[in-house]
């Protein structure tokens, strides 16, 4: 009888160990991401920081590698690449999708009254913003799962060859901006070119732009704005608040275990708190 008990225990132990062996053989889930930021931009550092949070919190069960803008696709091509599965995910801002669905820019360059960045994030999470964003993505057939984080303050008006002193100074001015601000400055008479961050300073250096705004003084300095312009005009109404976007290919996100999805959400909140 004792031999039968030992035999039964051995069979049970073997059965219990089978799933553990299968899990060990499957290994970690690896994801390749790209940001919309140049490698030297502090925003790419934020993208790397988010990936590290997820990698550490999952204990290596999910490993995210983040490449800088242009490594796989141009910065403005991130949404399509993630939707199609060319990339597993990405880090950027909703305003960069303006050409696909201009309402997406409401989260980043909306009217200069009402909500600041923290209020936008609160509305997005608790007031129906996330559901609206999902509907907008569905309207253009985008297969993505989006998370917003990281409140950012009002942006500078931009860098210019000479000071802007009146509205008329924008007439005929070759200017870089993005999102709904494209329509705003176009209506003011500017010739607007919506370039990604890494292309702005070279364009100003070649005289293709008379002025440009990107985001903040730290990023602008790292990208070389002071090398091509000595006039920086602070504060503006064109982009009073902005947030980052974390984006997954939805098919791949939906296939993740519930535990990893919870960690992704927690890492997003932690990254937002850091800012």
Show the residue positions of the predicted features.
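N-terminal secretory/targeting leader peptides
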Residues: 3-120, 132-275
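A short acidic, glycine-rich active-site loop
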Residues: 120-127
């Amino acid at each position: 009888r004792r031999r039968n008990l030992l035999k039964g225990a051995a069979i049970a132990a073997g059965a219990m160990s089978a799933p553990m062996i299968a899990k060990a053989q499957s290994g970690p889930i690896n994801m390749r991401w790209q940001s919309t930021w140049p490698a030297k931009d502090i925003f790419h550092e934020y993208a790397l920081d988010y990936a590290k949070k997820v990698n550490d919190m999952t204990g290596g069960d999910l490993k995210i590698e983040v490449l800088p803008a242009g490594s796989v696709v141009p910065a403005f091509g991130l949404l399509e690449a993630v939707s199609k599965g060319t990339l597993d995910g990405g880090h950027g801002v909703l305003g960069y999708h303006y050409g696909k669905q201009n309402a997406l820019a409401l989260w980043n360059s909306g009217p200069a009254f009402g909500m600041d960045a923290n209020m936008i994030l609160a509305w997005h999470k608790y007031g129906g913003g996330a559901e609206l964003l999902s509907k907008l993505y569905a309207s253009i057939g985008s297969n993505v799962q989006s998370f917003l984080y990281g409140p950012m303050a009002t942006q500078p008006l931009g860098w210019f060859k000479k000071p802007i002193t009146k509205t008329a100074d924008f007439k005929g001015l070759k200017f870089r901006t993005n999102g709904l601000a494209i329509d705003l400055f176009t209506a003011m008479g500017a010739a607007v070119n919506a370039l990604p961050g890494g292309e702005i300073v070279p364009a100003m250096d070649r005289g293709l732009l008379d002025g440009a705004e990107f985001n903040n003084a730290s990023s602008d300095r790292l990208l070389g704005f002071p090398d091509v312009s000595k006039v920086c005009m602070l504060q503006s109404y064109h982009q009073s608040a902005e947030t980052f976007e974390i984006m997954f290919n939805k098919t791949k996100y939906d296939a993740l275990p519930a535990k990893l999805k919870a960690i992704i959400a927690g890492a997003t909140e932690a990254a937002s708190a850091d800012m």
